[in-house]
């Protein structure tokens, strides 16, 4: 389960992307979460997914 606090979500998602997943799509598939839900939550605090960096920046 991913945290509901957006700052914690950012930290956890970026850590998982860095350490365990080659893409946001792979993370979402494995954790059975919506990519749109994560990207919308993090967009709300000014972050967007960068495919080149495989991180939210």
Where are these regions (language model features)?
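Short, charge-rich amphipathic interface segments used for partner binding and complex assembly
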Residues: 32-57
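N-terminal acidic leader/helix
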Residues: 1-23
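Short alpha-helical "recognition helix" segments of helix-turn-helix
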Residues: 27-28
């Amino acid at each position: 389960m991913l945290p509901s606090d957006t700052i914690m979500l950012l930290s956890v998602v970026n850590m998982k992307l860095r350490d365990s997943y080659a893409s946001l799509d792979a993370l979402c598939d494995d954790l059975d979460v919506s990519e749109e839900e994560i990207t919308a939550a993090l967009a709300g605090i000014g972050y967007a997914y960068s495919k080149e960096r495989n991180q939210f920046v």
